[in-house]
Amino acid sequence: IIDEQLLWFAYTQSGDPVAFFIVIPDLNQIIKHLNGRLNWWGMIKFLLLKMRGALTRACGVIFGVVPDHQGKGVESAIALRFRTAARENPFYPYETMDMNWVGDFNPKMLRFVSQLGATNEKTYITYRLFFNPDQPFSRCPKVG
């Protein structure tokens, strides 16, 4: 289920696509009320909950900019437009947005998230267990 308010694309003046930002509604807010049953009654209940406004959270899924246009303000323009569109629309149903799995090795994406006005509420830590303890460990290099 995709909400058109959450899909953003950027184009050049000639009409070539240069960037996109795709966000989806967090359907877990509704699915938890179905108790794992997505039968006919579950589908009706799903639609009723959706129409009633049970979806208040969205999840940022993917963001990308064509390499030739990176660092030219396209990222900031999408972030600013997304943010103002949400604030200007009185019927905008989403109160929060999760931007999961933005690694600390990706400073460009961290900057984009901060431009959206986001705060860091969760930090995920990935642990490694080497079967060969003599193998050297190297951290993931920074992107960009």
Regions found by a protein language model. Give the residues of each.
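A conserved beta-strand-loop-helix scaffold within acyl/acetyltransferase catalytic domains
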Residues: I1-V65
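Terminal substrate-recognition subdomain of acyl/acetyltransferases
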Residues: D3, Q13-S14, F46, M51, ...
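Generic structural motif recognizing short loop/turn segments at the entrances and edges of beta-strands
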Residues: D16-P17, T56, V74, T123-I125
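Aromatic side chains
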Residues: F20, H69, Y124-Y127
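Short coil/turn motifs at secondary-structure junctions
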Residues: D26-N28, D68, D104, N132
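Short conserved micro-motifs at the rims of enzyme active sites and ligand-binding pockets
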Residues: K32-L34, Q70-G73, L110-R111, F137-C140
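Short linear motifs at secondary-structure transitions and domain/linker junctions
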Residues: H33-W40, G73-E75, N100-N106
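Conserved acetyl-CoA-binding loop-helix of GNAT-fold acetyltransferases
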Residues: R57, V61-R87, Q115
